[in-house]
Swiss-Prot record:
GO molecular function, one term: toxin activity
Protein name per its UniProtKB record: U1-lycotoxin-Ls1i
InterPro entries in alphabetical order: Spider_toxin_CSTX_knottin (IPR019553), Spider_toxin_CSTX_Knottin_CS (IPR011142)
Free-text domain note: The presence of a 'disulfide through disulfide knot' structurally defines this protein as a knottin.
Tissue specificity annotation: Expressed by the venom gland.
Main location (coarse class): secreted
Family listed: Belongs to the neurotoxin 19 (CSTX) family. 04 (U1-Lctx) subfamily.
Length: 107
């Protein structure tokens, strides 16, 4: 039963990884076409660093590309601003946990 769960988790991880690659490629193509006249793309943004001004510029992690995650922050003046950082979405964290667990079991 455990082997079946590990195999299913690996399949879900592979499908998620391949779909994430396809979506990232589409987003990158759209972004590049919009930025054709602007300066060349800057280096990617590391995990936990701010991506408010470049939401598609996050680096790749071990298995997946980090996603720019945003939240609304209210300052002491009562002004609302959006702050974003590159991070790993929960479903990607779960997939990485399953793969790590599988590596420990199967060596």
């Amino acid at each position: 039963m455990m082997k079946v769960l590990v195999v299913v988790a690996l399949l879900v991880t592979l499908i998620s990884y391949s779909s994430s690659e396809g979506i990232d490629d589409l987003e990158a193509d759209e972004l590049l076409s919009l930025m054709a006249n602007e300066q060349t793309r800057k280096e990617c943004i590391s995990k936990h660093h701010e991506c408010t001004s470049n939401k598609h510029g996050c680096c790749r992690g071990n298995f997946f590309k980090y996603k720019c995650q945003c939240t609304t922050v209210v300052t002491q003046d009562g002004e609302q601003t959006e702050r974003c950082f590159c991070g790993t979405p929960p479903h990607h964290k779960a997939a990485e946990l399953v793969v790590g667990f599988g590596k420990k079991i199967f060596g």
